[in-house]
Amino acid sequence: STGHYYSDDKGNWYYKDANGENLKGAQTIDGQNVYFENNGRQVKGDFAEDGYYYDGNSGQRVTNSYVRRGASLWFYVDAEGRKLFGEQTINNQDVYFDQNYGTQVKGNFASNGYYYDEDSGARVDFGKNQFVKVDNNWYYVDNQGKIVKGAQTIDG
């Protein structure tokens, strides 16, 4: 059975099958894994309901890559195309992805207590058992290099 892609006046893409019906859900067309919403619109440049990210141009499922959603939200998808969560090592860099949403932590402390660079997202080594200044705020890092919170006795 053959079909064809077509677009609407808003630049959205669809695929009609041999019966003239719009495809829906996960599909493989010409060897490419693509996804169509319930209204038939192809998902491009975003995560679909199946949890995978689809390329903004080709619409093909993305694997083993950083992907961006909107202006500044970064994610990483694995060999299957699924979001990563928590502490990860990618390209020899220790990075962190939010446990709930999978967004990369940049320019902030993650829930694991480490700080991640605002540009690269790589974990910053502040040393151990010392005060550090980040964005005009002072923090204390413990013997593991993690930020401490709450009341603390330092050198006491």
In which residue ranges do the predicted regions lie?
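Extracellular adhesion/carbohydrate-binding repeat motifs centered on closely spaced tryptophans
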Residues: 1-156
